[in-house]
């Protein structure tokens, strides 16, 4: 007996569907969702990119979407309370909160919010992200924002952690020049393509991180239609900035590699401001990636 499953609209049955339209982020703001394989350096990349936008005179908000809530600590120089923790303290009566309860000013005026998440094995992180945006809207904290960056948990592409895609103009994918990172990137591309049918998000390109070479990334890009927007080599200054709990823009520019990295982040920010041409990308099947990547 063959069972035929009825076709369902994108995302049906998950929390990102039928969002209150009032939760949308204002038109005019540049909204970027940063994805990539777990541990690839998304938070470092997001924070340094936020800092770069601020150096270009933009009003920036970074939203960490990971229960670890460590997205913004290089901007704020500390671990800040999460939205979900603050809401629990007031029994989820958001009207009792003040902006300073959940939004924290970081380097060069970058505003920082950590959405947090439910306890392990319970609830949905995507719901928390939606509640965070709703809270920011209620307090009119998005009205004068030029750039919003969502730093998203790992390479999870379930309905919940695809929630930032509902708000984003562009998605940037952080990867390294290795098989596992590119394999994860391919899955993210497939998820974004699915969401792009219903939402305005489009692929902006690839950020190559901790990679001396780009041969495997470029091989994948050529097959799929992706494009490398920035290339950060395995520079020790980036690692040291994390240890110092600061952005790369707070490091001594005379130190080896610092100025080069700063300039690359500023260049990436300028490219995004200049309205990047969205990419038409076709993900590969798993077997195709195995056949494509690696050395002959």
UniProtKB/Swiss-Prot annotation:
CDD domains: Bchl-like (cd02032). Disulfide bonds: none annotated. GO terms for molecular function: 4 iron, 4 sulfur cluster binding; ATP binding; metal ion binding; oxidoreductase activity, acting on iron-sulfur proteins as donors; oxidoreductase activity, acting on the CH-CH group of donors, iron-sulfur protein as acceptor. It comes from the Bacteria. PROSITE patterns: NIFH_FRXC_1, NIFH_FRXC_2, NIFH_FRXC_3. Its EC number is 1.3.7.7. Component of the dark-operative protochlorophyllide reductase (DPOR) that uses Mg-ATP and reduced ferredoxin to reduce ring D of protochlorophyllide (Pchlide) to form chlorophyllide a (Chlide). This reaction is light-independent. The L component serves as a unique electron donor to the NB-component of the complex, and binds Mg-ATP. This is Light-independent protochlorophyllide reductase iron-sulfur ATP-binding protein.
């Amino acid at each position: 007996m063959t069972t035929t499953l009825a076709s369902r609209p994108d995302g049906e049955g998950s929390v990102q569907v039928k969002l209150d339209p009032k939760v949308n982020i204002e038109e005019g703001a540049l909204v970027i969702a940063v994805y990539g394989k777990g541990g690839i350096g998304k938070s470092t990349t997001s924070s340094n990119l936020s800092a770069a936008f601020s150096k270009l005179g933009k009003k920036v908000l970074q939203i960490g979407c990971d229960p670890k809530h460590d997205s913004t600590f290089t901007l704020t120089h500390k671990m800040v309370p999460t939205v979900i923790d603050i809401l629990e303290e007031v029994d989820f009566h958001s009207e009792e909160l003040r902006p300073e309860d959940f939004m924290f000013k970081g380097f060069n005026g970058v505003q920082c919010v950590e959405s947090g998440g439910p306890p392990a094995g319970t609830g949905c992180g995507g719901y928390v992200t939606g509640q965070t945006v709703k809270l920011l809207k209620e307090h009119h904290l998005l009205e004068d924002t030029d750039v919003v960056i969502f730093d998203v948990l790992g390479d999870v592409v379930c309905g919940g952690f695809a929630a930032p895609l509902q708000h984003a103009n562009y998605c940037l994918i952080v990867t390294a020049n290795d098989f596992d990172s590119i394999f994860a990137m391919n899955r993210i591309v497939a998820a974004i393509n699915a969401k792009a049918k219903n939402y305005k998000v489009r692929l902006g390109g690839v950020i190559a991180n901790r990679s001396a070479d780009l041969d495997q990334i470029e091989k994948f890009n050529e097959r799929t239609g992706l494009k490398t927007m920035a290339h950060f080599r395995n520079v020790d200054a980036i690692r040291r900035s994390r240890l110092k709990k600061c952005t790369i823009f707070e490091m001594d520019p005379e130190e080896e590699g610092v100025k080069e990295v700063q300039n690359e982040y500023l260049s990436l920010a300028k490219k995004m401001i200049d309205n990047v041409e969205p990419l038409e990308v076709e993900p590969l099947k798993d077997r195709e990636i195995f056949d494509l990547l690696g050395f002959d």
